[in-house]
């Protein structure tokens, strides 16, 4: 099944682009050493957007909620799908949702990346992994903040 982490061909994950008045939350991936948005694999019975919200809450310690439009069935707008090759020959699909992180300082629990903070839009764009940078440029422009490149 595509949502199964052990599936051979396709891994699907859900992640949250966490934004607020302070900018964007980025964290340093513990294994890869790159700066990304919170996210992870989808648990059994979970939707990709449920996973994005749960992972955002777990990895940041923030009270989070969907920031983009949510339809009558409670399904939030899908902001971006990132497609890239995974480490073991599989295709990785990351479904990204816009999440409101409020204004508090991140407080990640033990076991999650401790390298996490709010970055203003320009700093986030500079620091983010290339796969995230493009959507941050678009979001920054549509939110009336950050650069217009």
Predicted ranges, named:
Residues 20-21:
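A cytosolic small-molecule/anion-sensing beta-strand core signal
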Residues 43-134:
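Unchanged
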Residues 1-15:
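Acidic, metal-coordinating catalytic segment for phosphate/diphosphate chemistry
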């Amino acid at each position: 099944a595509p949502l199964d982490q052990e599936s051979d061909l396709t891994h699907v994950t859900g992640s949250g682009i966490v934004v607020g008045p302070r900018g964007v939350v980025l964290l340093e991936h513990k294994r890869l050493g790159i700066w990304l948005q919170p996210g992870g694999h989808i648990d059994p019975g979970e939707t990709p957007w449920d996973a994005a919200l749960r992972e955002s809450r777990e990895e940041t310690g923030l009270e989070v909620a969907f920031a983009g439009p949510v339809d009558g069935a409670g399904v939030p707008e899908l902001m971006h799908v990132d497609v890239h090759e995974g480490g073991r020959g599989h295709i990785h699909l990351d479904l990204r949702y816009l999440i409101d992180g409020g204004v508090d300082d991140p407080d990640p629990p033990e076991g999650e990346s401790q390298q996490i903070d709010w970055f203003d839009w320009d700093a986030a764009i500079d620091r983010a992994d290339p796969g995230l940078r493009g959507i941050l440029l678009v979001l920054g422009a549509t939110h009336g903040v950050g650069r217009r490149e």
